[in-house]
Amino acid sequence: MPFVTTDDGVRLYYEEAGTGTPLIFVHEFAGDHRSWEPQIRFFARRYRCIAYSARGYTPSDVPPPGSDYSQERVWQDLRCLMDGLNIAQAHLVGLSMGGFACLHFGLHHGTQGTASRALSLTLAGCGTGSHPAVYEGFKAQSKVLADEIQTLGAQHLANTYGMGPSRLQFKAKDPRGYAEFNARLAEHSALGSALTSRGYQGERPSLYALTEQIAHINVPTLIMTGDEDEPCLEPSLLLKRTIHTAVLAMLPGSGHAINLEEPQWFNQFLAEFLAQVEQGHDFARPVATRPESIWGPSGDPR
């Protein structure tokens, strides 16, 4: 089995297919490297596609309590993966927790020029728990969930978190696909999921506190969200307004795991975006078209 070892000694399992420009997929809290199979099969025809399982997600290592499960560590793991595979630059695609990882990678390596290691960013379903009105509650809920997972196991996670409001659209449209997703969720390491929920989910900073840093990102950025993924709607608009090289795609009648729920739409939007990036399209919005405020008409909610 192929692994890359991070600079703090954690082995990350990865799979790859295809040749060409590297295209790296970063999974959500309820997923793992297998979550990207519909994308790997499609994009491996023209890209070097790589999907990996984050620390805490088998077959990657599950570091014990006291180890580093943090937002900072997660984007560093992505960098270690690239270093281990001798990848200087790549297109980065992340869903939810993976979207946060790609965004934070972009904060350090998302400025065009010789220092940029991100050719583009795709941030899908990114922003749950970020709005100031729900931020503290989300952090508290993440820690409660961590305790429940550690006590009751991953099957409990599948029976509760896997049945959340933004998952029901997937279940209704594609019962077989949803059943596969939920069965895989029940296979997760309870310890790894608990530590991720407590450390990464429960301690990550709000996007609303990072707008000045996010505004420095100037690589092409695709923001995607389902229009029924309520926790991600406002944060997606915030990202669109803040990153001046961003475009926004909203998938109708769709929930959170849009790459699995609507793989054809997801792949179509991503393929068109990547084609424009590789053709040298200028994604920078003219100053005259930019919003007066990144907060929208309701004003700063902080």
Residue ranges and their predicted role:
Residues 246-302:
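Catalytic active-site module of serine/aspartate enzymes centered on a nucleophile-bearing elbow/loop
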Residues 72-90:
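Conserved acidic catalytic loop of the alpha/beta-hydrolase fold
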Residues 103, 107, 115-152, 156:
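Flexible "cap/lid" loop of the alpha/beta hydrolase fold
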Residues 132-137, 151-213:
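Conserved alpha/beta-hydrolase catalytic His-Asp/Glu region
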Residues 6-67:
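Conserved HGGG/HGGXW glycine-rich cap/lid loop of the alpha/beta-hydrolase fold
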Residues 94, 98, 102:
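Gly/Ala-rich beta-loop-alpha elbow adjacent to hydrolase catalytic centers
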Residues 230-235:
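Conserved alpha/beta-hydrolase "acid-adjacent" motif
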Residues 217, 223-225:
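Short beta-strand/loop motif that positions the catalytic acidic residue
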